[in-house]
Amino acid sequence: MASFPDCVNENEIGKAKFIGELIPPVAPFDQKSGRETWTVAFAPDGSYFAWSQGHRIVRLVPWKKCLASFSVRKEDRSSGAGPRRLSRQNSEGSLLPGEPREHTIDCGDIVWGLAFGSSVPEKQSRCVNIEWHRFKFGQDQLLLATGLNNGRIKIWDVYTGKLLLNLMDHTDIVRDLTFAPDGSLVLVSASRDKTLRVWDLKDDGNMVKVLRGHQNWVYCSAFSPDSSVLCSVGAGKAVFLWDMDKYTLIRKLEGHHNDVVCCEFSPDGALLATASYDTRVIVWDPHTATVLLELGHLFPPPSPIFAGGANDRWVRSVAFCHDGRHIASVTDDRLVRFWSIDEKSPQAIGPLTNGLCCAFSTDGSVLSAGSRDGSVHFWASPRSIASLQHLCRMTLRRVMPTQQVYTLPIPFSMQDYLAYKTL
């Protein structure tokens, strides 16, 4: 079996441009377990990059400064300089006034999930009857949520590195965290205790709702861009869509043959990508529950029985680029792949040993990927100028579900294009 179909020559696939890597400091104890980078994240405004570098530690790095350091290291490679290795101390010396600071945060337990949240003051708390709150989040507030091995969630102030809240209700590992993108500071946590919990940080972190329905571990969750729908995925081939206004299950998506471990919506909310241990990434229409595209990582495509068991092509993570046209995936075959939604073969590939997670930068220009040794690797995302047709499609689909597209008085071919049926 191979990583690419017979019609594709691996040597002809583009090579992703490697930018740099971050290496954690050497731990004071020799333990291989607990040093994994299970998650990486970029702040919504692009100001910070965060990753769990293992052994309870989360590192917050100013992204522009980090990116600039990669350029410097590239120039120094001729002199034999290695990758950037971070010290255990915060590099706060020689900072200009107002310049973002690096922070090293000891979370007290192994970190599995990370998420940035930013506040919009005019977005009211869902608990409208409560007039007094301990925390008054301003317009420039930026928070970091960390999900821990002991089931706790800790909320940190990104600018100061100080602990603000400690959320306790899960009874097992908090595997993933996601903030609503509307600035409401509504946080959803996915746990191995088979539940999703909804927290309102503007109401001092009170829990709003428990979403039940998964019969096994919940691996990941993701909000739609308008915050109205939540996708959650987990063990047992589960892909659930939830109405976040009523906190009810909308539908289940069926098509995977193994555990589903990652999910993400496209920027216009018209597409949903899910990654599974069955060697595939499936791109869905979340409005109609139909499969639009399958991105295979093992060829010939395995049978459902083989895909449902142990194989060496487990897809660990998937991420949508902010241009709405590119997807990245991390797999156990030691490759990171960059896909275009217009093609069924990778546009570019890069080497990555023991990759676990990936995320695009806010502007979509860089992909970061974490690995089992606590390091993070960065590649330049393959970019091209989007057609005006695609930009118009994204603009329209941000406000129009698939069902409404097919009521428009336009040719059927244009309806199919707007509905992404031409993928």
Curated annotation (Swiss-Prot):
Name of the gene encoding the protein in the UniProt record: wsb1
SUPFAM superfamilies: Nitrous oxide reductase, N-terminal domain (SSF50974), SOCS box-like (SSF158235), WD40 repeat-like (SSF50978)
CDD domains in UniProt: SOCS_WSB1_SWIP1 (cd03746), WD40 (cd00200)
Function text: Probable substrate-recognition component of a SCF-like ECS (Elongin-Cullin-SOCS-box protein) E3 ubiquitin-protein ligase complex which mediates the ubiquitination and subsequent proteasomal degradation of target proteins.
Disordered, as annotated region: 76-100
Segments forming domain SOCS box: 373-423
Pathway stated in the Swiss-Prot or TrEMBL entry: Protein modification; protein ubiquitination
GO biological process: intracellular signal transduction; protein polyubiquitination
InterPro entries with a match to the protein in the record: G-protein_beta_WD-40_rep, N2O_reductase_N, SOCS_box, SOCS_box-like_dom_sf, WD40/YVTN_repeat-like_dom_sf, WD40_repeat_CS, WD40_repeat_dom_sf, WD40_rpt
SMART domains, per database record: SOCS, SOCS_box, WD40
Cell inner membrane as UniProt keyword: no
Organism, scientific name: Danio rerio (Zebrafish)
Subunit note: Component of a probable ECS E3 ubiquitin-protein ligase complex that contains the Elongin BC complex.
Swiss-Prot/TrEMBL WD repeat ranges: 125-166, 169-209, 213-252, 255-294, 310-347
Domain remarks in the Swiss-Prot or TrEMBL record: The SOCS box domain mediates the interaction with the Elongin BC complex, an adapter module in different E3 ubiquitin ligase complexes.
Name of the molecule in the record: WD repeat and SOCS box-containing protein 1
Keywords: Repeat, Ubl conjugation pathway, WD repeat
